[in-house]
Regions:
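Extracytoplasmic/periplasmic, Sec-exported soluble proteins
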Residues: 2-3, 22, 26, 45, ...
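Bilobed periplasmic-binding protein-like "clamshell/Venus-flytrap" ligand-binding domains
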Residues: 42-45, 87-122
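Alpha-helix capping/termination and helix-coil
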Residues: 10-15, 38, 83, 87, ...
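Short, solvent-exposed loop/beta-turn-alpha elements that line the ligand-binding surface or hinge
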Residues: 32-37, 58-85, 114-145
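Periplasmic binding protein-like
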Residues: 12-61
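Bilobed "Venus flytrap"/periplasmic-binding protein-like clamshell domains
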Residues: 1-9
C-alpha cells in the first residue's frame, strides 16, 4: 500500500521510532484490531453518513462504538451535548469548532489525507446530481439532449 509505505518511510526518519507495519484485510482491521483495541496506531478511514460535521465529531464521544482509539475527554463530551441541543447555527458552529480544536490539540487523530473524486460530463448530459455524502451520483434525473 503506497500510503502505508510513505508513512513508514516518514516515521522511520524520526530518531528512536521504529515502525512495524502489519498489513491486514479490512474485515480483520475493523472487527478484530480496531474493535478490540489490538493496535498502537492504525490507518483507517471515515466517510460522512450525512451532511453535518457531527458525522465526524461524534467519533470523539466517550464510548462511541467507532471511537477505536478509546479517546475520552470530558470537555469534548460536554461540548457535544451542547452541539446536540443548540438550535442557533452560528453558536452550534462555534461549539463544533471547539470540539475539533480540542480533539486536534489532544492528538485524538491525525488527518493524513482527504479522499477526492473527479468526473467528466459531456455537455449534452443534463440533470446529473452530485452529492458530497452517501451515493456520489444520482442518475434518476439524467437526460441526454
Amino acid at each position: 500500500d503506497t500510503m502505508a509505505e510513505y508513512l513508514q518511510g516518514s516515521f522511520s526518519k524520526l530518531k528512536g521510532l521504529k515502525v512495524n507495519m502489519v498489513a491486514t484485510v479490512k474485515k480483520d482491521r475493523i472487527y478484530n484490531r480496531e474493535a478490540n483495541g489490538n493496535f498502537q496506531v492504525v490507518c483507517t478511514r471515515w466517510g460522512p453518513d450525512y451532511a453535518d460535521p457531527t458525522t465526524y465529531l461524534n467519533l470523539f464521544l466517550t464510548g462511541n462504538q467507532n471511537n477505536y482509539g478509546k479517546y475520552s475527554n470530558a470537555k469534548v463530551d460536554s461540548l457535544m451535548k451542547q452541539v446536540q441541543a443548540e438550535s442557533d447555527l452560528n453558536k452550534r458552529w462555534d461549539l463544533m469548532t471547539q470540539v475539533e480544536k480540542t480533539a486536534l490539540d489532544d492528538l485524538a487523530y491525525i488527518p493524513v489525507f482527504e479522499k477526492g473524486a473527479a468526473a467528466l460530463k459531456a455537455k449534452n448530459v443534463k440533470g446529473l446530481v452530485h452529492s458530497a455524502v452517501g451515493v456520489p451520483y444520482t442518475f434518476k434525473y439524467v437526460t441526454i439532449k
